[in-house]
């Protein structure tokens, strides 16, 4: 969970770059794992987890875009409320 927070904190571009660096690191670890079978199995599990995180990255990006869209809509709603508020006052007067 902590690693995901770190990825979000780094930003979109850096997040992708860091994931690429992690993939390179996995490759270098695989070279070492050839010398010991035990590490090979553990690293295999780690690779699967990292692949899952990479698949989630674009989803998180979409969520951020959706949040930005909601904020824009919220601003529009505020404007429409301001426009609507004088109308009832006019009918009252």
Swiss-Prot record:
The keyword Phosphoprotein applies. Residues 37-57 have a biased composition (Acidic residues). InterPro entries: PRMP3. GO terms for cellular component: cytoplasm; nucleosome; nucleus. Keywords: Chromosome, Developmental protein, Differentiation, DNA condensation, DNA-binding, Nucleosome core, Nucleus, Phosphoprotein, Spermatogenesis. The modification Phosphoserine is found at residue 85. Residues 1-93 are annotated as: Disordered. It is found in: Nucleus; Chromosome. Residues 81-93 have a biased composition (Polar residues). GO terms for biological process: cell differentiation; chromosome condensation; flagellated sperm motility; spermatogenesis. GO terms for molecular function: DNA binding. It comes from the Eukaryota. Protamines substitute for histones in the chromatin of sperm during the haploid phase of spermatogenesis. They compact sperm DNA into a highly condensed, stable and inactive complex. Belongs to the protamine P3 family. This is Protamine-3. It comes from Bos taurus (Bovine).
